[in-house]
Amino acid sequence: MNLDFASVWETISDIIPDNDALICGEEVVSWKEYDLRSSKIATALSEAGLSSNSKAGLYLNNSNEYLICQNAIFKVGGCPINVNYRYVEEELIYLLENSDSEAVFYHACYGAVSYTHLTLPTSDLV
């Protein structure tokens, strides 16, 4: 029996699929939808070559999206790298490059930050 986060959350989704899993403001996501959304992202990560021990940055505010992306990373056996929203470009680049991140999830409000100097191995996943 696997006791990793993704397996536990999948089991919960199987048992109580229609119960609320995530609540952020007015947005409510059921366990079934939580598992479905994170599975779709996990599939995209796998297809892009991320797998066990791959790292992906989460440059997101506290939100349902953060938890969905985090679970997707867990589903492929990867390691989520939390990125402080207060980081300036230089700190962001340092963290993501030195953590060996292969992907970055970010909210649109952070899209103005330049990623031109960022050298991720899988740069299509920024």
Where are the regions a protein language model picked out?
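Conserved AMP-binding/adenylate-forming core of the ANL superfamily
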Residues: D18-N71, V88-I93, E97
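Anion (oxyanion) recognition and catalysis
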Residues: F74
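Conserved ATP-dependent adenylate/AMP-binding module captured primarily in the ANL superfamily
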Residues: Y87-S114
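Single conserved hydrophobic/aromatic residue that forms the stacking wall/gate
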Residues: H117-V126
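A short N-terminal helical cap/helix-turn-helix that marks the beginning
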Residues: M1-D20
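Structured binding elements
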Residues: G77
